[in-house]
């Protein structure tokens, strides 16, 4: 492996900077499509674990939604048992949770949760084109084909699923010196809404 995946497959799935005007444009287009007005937007509930960190993150999201889009929200912090139960049963408007991407890539972990075969109220996503891209990536016979097919799955995911990456953390890997031809980055965990 030479270099990073991002160097080989350049793509910005989600812009790193906010575009309030574009967000307002999308909101207005959605309202027009539904035949609704901004006054008819309900108050949304933001479900999270009852930790101060989760509450603080959702307070920032709450402020951004109100300030930029005029959308009212309430924060519903719950014990881990209640939060997981509500998330798994689909009893939420927006859920703040986390997921590990795994190594060597996200195909066997995170992205598999969006295939039609993995239907649950937690994700509630089904798309035949996504399934086809995912299956091709999983069945790729070489690392080069797997990377190229993974990239197509990742692009489709970024462009078509309702998922908002709010931040990420990483961890380190250690390996014995003297190995050659070995490349590894840190494992990435991210939190999404």
Residue ranges, per PLM feature:
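Structural transition elements
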Residues: 1-30, 51-56
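Detector for C-terminal structural segments
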Residues: 1-7, 53-62, 85-193
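Short helix/loop segment immediately N-terminal to the Walker
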Residues: 30-43
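Short secondary-structure junction motifs
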Residues: 39-41, 70, 161-163
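Short, well-ordered beta-strand elements
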Residues: 41-50, 73-76, 93
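Short helix-initiation/N-cap motifs at beta->coil->alpha
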Residues: 52, 75-85
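Short alpha-helix C-terminal cap/hinge motif
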Residues: 60-75
